Swiss-Prot record:
Residues 102-290 form the DH domain. It comes from the Eukaryota. The keyword RNA-binding does not apply. A zinc finger (FYVE-type) spans 458-518. It is found in: Cytoplasm; Nucleus; Early endosome; Early endosome membrane. It comes from Mus musculus. One of its GO terms (molecular function) is phosphatidylinositol phosphate binding. This is FYVE, RhoGEF and PH domain-containing protein 2. Residues 32-41 have a biased composition (Basic and acidic residues). InterPro entries: DBL_dom_sf, DH_dom, FGD1-4_PH2, FGD2_PH1, FYVE_RhoGEF_PH, PH-like_dom_sf, PH_domain, SOS1_NGEF_PH. The modification Phosphoserine is found at S10, S39, S47, S654.
Length: 655
């Protein structure tokens, strides 16, 4: 019967906590612990008004540093550290060895730390909070709303612990001989610990406001400093006291975990204590989630500020996945340019640094939607660690500073792509239902005009990729087809077609893409002419060649070295060596039938040099490495003897 009465009193106390919330105009001391009806053991020995002492000049000069978000997030990693728990309890020291059970010693430690914690809450709510509110109303030197933002919902937390949990815990310890259990008490506490999430989320903002107004308002600083110098504050700063509620839930979890470990296997409180531990763990996770959400929003805000707070990118629901500098490979310039990428869960922002670092740090040049984006590694000897990002809006060739950085960027992009595709598939399955179409969609073979192409770099070609006429700076300049990315001359790109990836705006396209996109018949006189013997595309050679690479042709007179050329032995014409001015040229400037040639390796004492000789004709080539020279010599010897790689005993020398 007595136990039932105790439970009824506990519920009444709990209801009173939330029915008697203080209003802004309420008297400052109307809910102090001294007014509560619990036993003398619960009374807190606080000096009545120590903060009324005259201001201390030295204390006014002290600096207050805001608690960083990094330090706040580190609290999540300390849940299992017993040493951390003990270091946070300077006023609690283990007493002499007694004969009481170990689980009771843990409960007594929980009670002692709870008493000290409620004293800190009383100091925060009834002293700091009320004194600052009174000063704000009297002097109008700082807004009352600022004070309320700094202390958040500390009043609810204080009343809950002072009027409900501490009295319940005290009664249970006093009656331990008759009721050796606390699991049921903790279970009553656990659901209300979620109120800490609001306090934790507001903590960093509160610390910033406190630091700001300590510098900005002299009356604000004087009130805080007077209280900090008092005996009740133990010479600790307000920020130190404000951190206690953030640390309290991890301490509950540590103490309760130790209590469960000390309980005997047949203890009547074991089941309730384990259930209470699970509930405390859930509350700790809830608090950690609040910290993570606060960090996410703060990180988003920092990025948005550096990008100039543009309306079309600012969205609090976004998730920042990765950001950092990269090098942009230009299709016109030989040296890559410094750029900055910001990857969100739904878009990739391609940014350029601003010349004047006033306000925004970067300017968003292109936004690429993750939906439909593709990423792959590029095999480019001139630009190592390079990768391609192809989106509907634009295709970018990028270079990282190391292979690890390149892999990290590619993995981050691919993870974002996979997540978007997974959500899309889930949505389609929900719309179609179990009776929906189960056939796998056929991949779209032709994406011409639907997504931005990869542009061929200017220096990779020396002639128009459509008409094979050589470029020059005056009469035949380079242009890019916006549909296929080929480098073409003005005559071959004098057409306009609407491209879907560019919001159906007319763009310069080549004749071939114009015909495909519009369906119009080729204009008279524009039909493709018959291919000549040298018109074998070099762009297809790396995938369809026995061997291909840059070779330097050494002249006969005075060993004069000519510019290096792109040389290919095609699979479909394995007895001929084609020499191109650039890798993407559609027409070779020289072809050498290899049948009957004699191959001499290293004629000039250089292991990278080899020579072709036949009937007074002589060609001397220099490879970029000894290994590459060996591959060329093997392939040419095979071709010179009339053998082709289709035989079963022949070896393919291509990579």
């Amino acid at each position: 019967m007595e136990r039932a009465c105790e439970k009824q009193d506990s519920v009444c106390n709990l209801v009173a906590v939330f029915e008697n919330n203080r209003t802004p105009g309420e008297a400052p001391g109307s809910h102090s612990l001294e007014d509560q009806p619990h036993s003398p053991e619960h009374q807190l020995s606080l000096s009545p008004e120590p903060w009324e002492a005259p201001p201390v000049k030295e204390a006014l000069k002290s600096e207050f540093r805001p608690v960083s978000r990094t330090y706040l997030s580190s609290l999540k990693n300390k849940l299992s550290s017993g040493a951390w728990r003990r270091s946070c309890q300077p006023g609690v020291s283990p007493g002499p060895e007694t004969q009481e059970p170990e689980e009771k010693r843990v409960v007594r430690e929980l009670l002692e730390t709870e008493q000290a914690y409620v004293a800190r809450l009383h100091l925060l709510d009834q002293v700091f909070f009320q004194e600052l509110l009174r000063e704000a109303g009297r002097s109008k030197a700082f807004p009352e709303d600022v004070v309320k933002l700094i202390f958040s919902n500390i009043s609810s937390i204080y009343r809950f612990h002072a009027q409900f949990f501490l009295p319940e815990l005290q009664r249970r310890v006093d009656d331990w001989a008759a009721t050796p259990r606390i699991g049921d008490v903790i279970q009553k506490l656990a659901p209300f610990l979620k109120m800490y999430s609001e306090y934790v989320k507001n903590f960093e903002r509160a610390a910033e406001l406190l630091a700001t107004w300590m510098d900005k308002s002299q009356p604000f600083q004087e009130v805080v400093t007077r209280i900090q110098c008092s005996e009740a504050s133990s010479s600790l700063t307000l920020q130190h006291h404000m951190l206690e509620p953030v640390q309290r839930i991890p301490r509950y979890e540590l103490l309760l975990k130790e209590y469960v470990q000390k309980l005997p296997a047949q203890a009547p409180d074991l089941e309730d204590a384990q259930r209470a531990l699970d509930m405390i763990f859930s509350a700790a996770q809830h608090s950690n989630a609040a910290i993570a959400e606060m960090e996410r929003l703060q990180g988003l805000w920092d990025v948005y500020q550096r990008l100039g707070l543009e309306d079309d990118i600012v969205d609090p629901s976004n998730t920042l996945l990765r950001e950092g500098p990269v090098l942009k490979i230009s299709f016109r310039r030989s040296d890559p340019m410094e750029r900055y990428l910001v990857l969100f869960n739904n878009m990739l922002l391609y940014c350029v640094p601003r010349v004047l670092q006033v306000g925004a740090q970067f300017q968003v040049r292109t936004r690429i939607d993750v939906a439909g984006m593709k990423v792959r590694e590029l095999t480019d000897a001139e630009f190592p660690h390079s990768f391609l990002v192809s989106g509907k809006q634009r295709t970018l060739e990028l270079q990282a500073r190391s292979r690890d950085e390149m892999v990290s960027w590619m993995q981050a992009c691919q993870a974002a792509i996979d997540q978007v595709e997974k959500r899309s598939e889930t949505f389609k399955a929900a719309v179609q239902g179990p009776q929906g179409d189960t056939q796998e969609p056929k991949p779209q073979v032709e994406e011409l005009g639907l997504r931005a192409p990869q542009w061929v770099r200017d220096k990779m070609v020396t002639m128009c990729m459509r008409c094979q006429e050589p470029f020059n700076a005056l009469t035949r300049r380079r242009h890019h087809c916006r549909a296929c990315g080929y480098v073409v001359c003005a005559k071959c790109s004098d057409y306009r077609a609407e491209l879907k990836y560019d919001s159906n705006r007319p763009n310069r396209v080549c004749l071939t893409c114009y015909t495909f996109l519009t369906g119009n018949v080729l204009p008279q006189g524009k039909e493709d002419k018959r291919r000549g013997i040298l018109e074998k595309e070099a762009s297809a050679a790396p995938e369809q060649s026995l061997v291909c690479s840059f070779l330097q042709l050494i002249g006969d007179k005075c060993s004069r070295s000519l510019p290096r050329s792109w040389c290919v032995i095609p699979r479909d014409d394995p007895l001929v060596l084609y020499v191109y001015a650039a890798p993407q040229d559609t027409k070779a400037h020289t072809s050498i039938p290899l049948l009957g040639y004699q191959v001499i390796s290293g004629p000039q004492g250089d292991p990278r040099v080899f020579q072709l000789q036949q009937s007074g004709q002589q060609y001397t080539f220099k490879a970029e490495s000894v290994e590459l020279q060996g591959r060329w010599v093997t392939a040419i010897k095979r071709a010179a003897s009339g053998r082709t790689p289709e035989g079963p005993d022949e070896e393919d020398v291509s990579d």
